[in-house]
């Protein structure tokens, strides 16, 4: 029996007047085994509320969540992580994937692994770095971000097995960059290239976010999927977002 996963990312409830309440009410949890939320859900104190809304709506499902970059804005990594730990304690169906995995029970059920992923250190030009809000909005961002990236890369390269489902916020391959962003000076902050790992370890699915463009592509035997919403009320909302996007795996 296949698992049914619903994929959402980059909901950015901080841009919603009601902080996502009406949006969550419009979602259909019927028959969903796992709701996958691939980061950038809400910022600051709004994050626990947003997680609770989704967990209540999907009370018969698991909610698998990886942190994006925006959840850390205006806070420290330690404070944000503690907020999510507390939310997972208060919502029994919430699973925070932080270099960790869940194994669904039952015949044919697959393992789901996840991490934010982030990006490796590289000698960027100052203009590119100045354009990325992460460096100014997240307290103690450097060198913390590079350690988190190293940790995630090592974990995924070591743990992924054929047929697994992987969830990250950041893009795991340059192949996943939308055509309009090819050549952008910001791509090194959006992509951590795991292409060799994908080809070698052969997960069945890799689900991601961060970019605000839908993506359906293939690397070897792995389907690469992204279903982001974007910023409500702006030019950066994804016109191809599908709030009913369900994958059978």
Regions found by a protein language model. Give the residues of each.
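Active-site neighborhood of phospho(di)ester-bond hydrolases with catalytic His/Asp-centered motifs
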Residues: 7-9, 35-40, 64-69, 95-99, ...
